[in-house]
Amino acid sequence: MRCPTTWRGCARSSWAAAPPTSRRGPPGRVPARSGARPVGVDFPERRLATARAMQAEFGIDFPLLLGRAEEVPCGDDTFGPAISEYGASLWCDPHRWIPEAARVLVPGGLLVFMRYSPLFALCAPPGGRASTTLLRGQFGLGRLEWGERTEFVLPHGGMLRLLRSHGFVVEDLIEVQAPRPAHRDYAEVSADWAHEWPSEEIWKARLAG
């Protein structure tokens, strides 16, 4: 299924592999109920099957497309905002998915994405929990091999230059601090660590035009 041209300029879009398995509901739940026209894009098919099941559970319906963030099955200037919550922004090469985001966004469109922070990437061992020791150098940080998976975390300077090179203007960078008390620890980072240093961050960048 490809993105019909009738979706051009839609008010809200859940784009590029925003995880459909979150128990908060499908990524487009809130915009869909506010009258906007979200579109979900994810890969592989089993993740879309999970998203469809959650659409049924929450009583909403919007298009779900099978596709990769590096090659979104939609035309140029299709979406208003585009969102990636630990999908494209973590598991895809930013030198490929960011130019694709620029292609599918309308001029003035907003890109919002969440990812691991560079500091977390510097302090996290393969298969272990982030510590207070720097385990790798920041220069050259980008592609991280974690055994059976690969993730991408550019330093702040590299990400800023990449976004600017594709016409984006960064509006905000939110470094997320874990609350205290936190509701839980995670396998890759403790709540205490994430309270002292950001393990996650949210970027907001607008396409010029």
Residue ranges of each PLM-predicted region?
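A short SAM/SAH-binding and catalytic strip from SAM-dependent methyltransferases
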Residues: 80-95
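Conserved class I S-adenosyl-L-methionine
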Residues: 110-142
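A short glycine-rich, Lys/Arg-flanked "PGG" loop and its adjoining helix->strand segment in the class I
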Residues: 95-110
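Class I SAM-dependent methyltransferase SAM/SAH-binding core
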Residues: 11-71
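Core SAM-dependent methyltransferase catalytic element
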Residues: 166-168, 186-209
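Short alpha-helix
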Residues: 150-173
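Conserved alpha-helix/loop element of class I SAM-dependent methyltransferases that forms part
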Residues: 1-11
